[in-house]
């Protein structure tokens, strides 16, 4: 892990929407592709910053969705197709023609949409604790009810009390994670939920040729392991990696194990090398 590797933040206006963007630059010239990262619902950039710090030999770019973190509220609703287009334009702006794409939970759906919509610029795909959208196996009802409650972002005591129910296998660094969260606006959170209403990638995934790593937690209360197995069945060139005692936030609770799997997958020579256009 690099010492002092800090992101550069900027406010970028793309297609009439202003977004807070963060870019971590590689600490050394490695020739490795940048990572485009899509975060979970309601989660600001800082929520997953520790993971970006651990992958220090690649550029890493992510952004707050409208009304989330430091991005202003959306004026009108958006959908996954529109947001994938905005991500595509952001990569043009930051001169990243070919990337590896990664998404967690809600962001995993965005990562699928981006890969399906902009396949020519996606080298490899990593889907973490996510599903095929509308066609998913639901999680623990107790966790889903609490997840829908906006107090999980606004009230630290509520989050601390229900952390185990919400996220499963997270046993340490709970307070640290809670302190990194910034509550989304009500509009931002609602529009982010609305963006995926009725969305599913299932009919299209059998045509996705991108080399894909699917990572799931065996103790995930929100997106059960069965969803990862379904994705693995649908995507032709995929592999499934399971952290048996990992909850929904296993990227943080099992950081070393998770990062090792991610790095091994990304550094592995592709079956067919792809060159940036």
Model-identified regions with their sequence ranges:
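Conserved HGGG/HGGXW glycine-rich cap/lid loop of the alpha/beta-hydrolase fold
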Residues: 17-70
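Flexible "cap/lid" loop of the alpha/beta hydrolase fold
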Residues: 112, 116, 123-152
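Conserved alpha/beta-hydrolase catalytic His-Asp/Glu region
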Residues: 136, 156-206
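Short beta-strand/loop motif that positions the catalytic acidic residue
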Residues: 208, 214-216, 220
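Conserved alpha/beta-hydrolase "acid-adjacent" motif
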Residues: 221-227
């Amino acid at each position: 892990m690099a010492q002092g590797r800090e992101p550069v933040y900027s406010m970028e206006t793309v297609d009439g929407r202003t977004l807070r963007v963060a870019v971590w630059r590689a600490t050394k010239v490695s020739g490795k592709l940048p990572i485009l990262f899509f975060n979970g619902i309601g989660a600001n950039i800082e929520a997953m910053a520790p993971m970006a710090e651990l992958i220090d030999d690649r550029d890493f770019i992510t952004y707050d969705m409208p009304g989330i973190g430091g991005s202003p509220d959306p004026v009108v609703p958006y959908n996954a197709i529109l947001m994938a287009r905005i991500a595509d334009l952001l990569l043009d702006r930051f001169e990243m023609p070919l990337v590896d794409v990664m998404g967690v939970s809600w962001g995993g759906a965005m990562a699928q949409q981006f890969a399906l919509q902009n396949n020519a610029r996606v080298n490899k795909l990593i889907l973490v604790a996510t599903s095929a959208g509308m066609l998913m196996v639901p999680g623990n009802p107790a966790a889903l009810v609490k997840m829908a409650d906006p107090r999980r972002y606004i009230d630290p005591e509520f989050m601390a009390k229900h952390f185990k129910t919400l996220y499963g296998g997270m046993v340490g660094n709970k307070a640290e994670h809670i302190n990194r969260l910034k509550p989304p606006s009500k509009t931002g959170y609602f529009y982010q939920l609305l963006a995926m209403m009725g969305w599913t990638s299932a009919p299209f995934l059998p045509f996705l040729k991108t080399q894909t790593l699917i990572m799931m937690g065996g103790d995930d209360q929100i997106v059960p392991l069965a969803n990862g197995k379904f994705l693995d069945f649908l995507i032709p060139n995929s592999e499934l990696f399971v952290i048996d005692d990992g909850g929904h936030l296993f990227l943080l609770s099992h950081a070393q194990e998770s990062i090792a799997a991610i790095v091994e997958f990304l550094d592995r020579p592709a079956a067919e090398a792809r060159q940036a256009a």
